[in-house]
């Protein structure tokens, strides 16, 4: 069988190439060799959360794997079959649970049965989507493909202690994924959010929310509905400490766009709230139906769906363009066209391969 070769330093050269390559290998059951893994990063090679994604997909597909250790620059992955089931994976650090979800979800969707996956690690950590973005924006938008997924949050995990606990519940696809055709967002309908603070005073979450709401009212003329999540001392189940806020907008096209920010030591809660609001406003300003982060997460699903998908994204990022390049290597029979320049809003048109479970 032909082995697909992926240069891990292509495009943005980060862990995303590894996640998408392994994800496509697991879905298509094509073996892959990935080299120069995270070559452009200051600490190249596999990190613990990447290793968790490798081991998770190894278990889900009974794969033969070589090179799966922290620091490894090369990995060989040969999947045998896709198995639904109940799984549990512990990253063992504050490594991102949401990036592991990104890697394993396509394989589980194309398995012939229901799956439940418990993942222990970081839920709200730098350089990855926060868990509330995944719960309220990512899986919400995946509905358009006919995908039925839930993410349950039982405990938050922040850097450096981690310890978060999430459960991914996946109903298998009954047939080919539906293509999507959603370009412009249309009118803004409403804005929601969740502002959390764990192992910290309640006023941290309240100040984040208040600051975000002030910016949204001033710039958009909308009153957002932001939930406050905090816990009384002595009854806080989290390791913490940590805080963050995720905002999301419902729009006329039926999609959701998000904006988020994380708290950090020495960073005022008001700044956290303002950052999230300004990010959301920036995403909405393009007039497109999907935000820049959703843009790159849509790509594998557009390639795997049956027929032509068209999506309007607020920004054509490096991540999105790299996701397209990796997808084309695994699915050469697909057709892609992009209107727009890198760093600007764009329209992505992909004629998917219509993979069946």
Curated annotation (Swiss-Prot):
Its main location: cytoplasm. It catalyses: a 3'-end 3'-phospho-ribonucleotide-RNA + ATP = a 3'-end 2',3'-cyclophospho-ribonucleotide-RNA + AMP + diphosphate. One of its GO terms (cellular component) is cytoplasm. It is found in: Cytoplasm. It is an enzyme of class 6 (ligase). The keyword Ion transport does not apply. Pfam families: RTC (PF01137), RTC_insert (PF05189). One of its GO terms (molecular function) is RNA-3'-phosphate cyclase activity. Keywords: ATP-binding, Cytoplasm, Ligase, Nucleotide-binding. The keyword rRNA-binding does not apply. InterPro entries: RNA3'-term_phos_cycl_insert, RNA3'_phos_cyclase_dom, RNA3'_phos_cyclase_dom_sf, RNA3'_term_phos_cyc, RNA3'_term_phos_cyc_type_1, RNA3'_term_phos_cycl-like_CS, RNA3'P_cycl/enolpyr_Trfase_a/b, RPTC_insert. Its EC number is 6.5.1.4. The active site is at residue 319. Disulfide bonds: none annotated. Belongs to the RNA 3'-terminal cyclase family. Type 1 subfamily. Catalyzes the conversion of 3'-phosphate to a 2',3'-cyclic phosphodiester at the end of RNA. The mechanism of action of the enzyme occurs in 3 steps: (A) adenylation of the enzyme by ATP; (B) transfer of adenylate to an RNA-N3'P to produce RNA-N3'PP5'A; (C) and attack of the adjacent 2'-hydroxyl on the 3'-phosphorus in the diester linkage to produce the cyclic end product. The biological role of this enzyme is unknown but it is likely to function in some aspects of cellular RNA processing. This is RNA 3'-terminal phosphate cyclase. The gene is rtcA.
